[in-house]
Amino acid sequence: AEQESILASVTVDDLKINETSGVQYYKNLGMLHQAIQDSIKVSECYDETLFDLPAVILYLAWFGLTEEQIINFPKEDVLDDGVMINGEKTEMPFEILQIFKRLRDAEGYYQQARGVIFRAYVYSDNLIRTERNSKINVSKMQGLVNRLNTLMDGTYSLRYNVIHQSGIFYRAHLLECESTQFNLEDPEFASKVFCEDLSSKVKHTARIRDYKLYKQLFY
């Protein structure tokens, strides 16, 4: 219910945009969804389900999956009432879950060339597949995402790294609000919270600085 209300309440004005570099961070999943939908609307594409692939890639990035995990993500982990993320069922806002289910069940998409043609996906157990490949590599995945990002000239920074980091910071902030033992000065604790090795003092300091910027933007 909380996810649904977040999704319903987000407006374009909520997006924090730096004019020189686009969106630096996303506050929540609703904000990310809004940016993706805005981008797809300007595409004037004959079949908007063409963009289900990059959209799902970015939603999985938000939930903390690595690029390798995303390209190997199995269709069977998309359930009718949620998505299995790292072995746990995760509830999704209705609109986003519909995109996951649509991609899971899709046989391909329509494209307007000389007339309308149907591009069939190669059969695969993987959720992320194309008309040529039952499994794609990370470079191809980045290309799919970039196709979506360029629709609005990168204004929304729809890139894996931006969204992956935003999701981590969002969950870190939830934890900080709920926990009395939240101490980012401890490198081991910070490494667990930010899902990376922060034993290096330089990296540790930089990540805390980034997290503080995220909080200044949104809270």
PLM features per residue range, with description:
Residues 144-210, 214-219:
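Short, basic (Lys/Arg/His-rich) helix/loop patches that form interaction surfaces
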Residues 32-44, 142-155:
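Short amphipathic alpha-helical segments and their helix-coil junctions
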Residues 86-131:
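Basic, alpha-helical nucleic-acid-contacting "clamp/cap" segments
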Residues 3-39:
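Flexible interdomain linker/hinge and immediately adjacent N-terminus
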Residues 29, 50-55, 138-142, 161-165, ...:
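Short, leucine-enriched amphipathic alpha-helices that occur as contiguous helical runs
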Residues 18-25, 122-144:
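An acidic intrinsically disordered interaction segment
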Residues 56-82:
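Short, charged phosphate-coordinating catalytic segments
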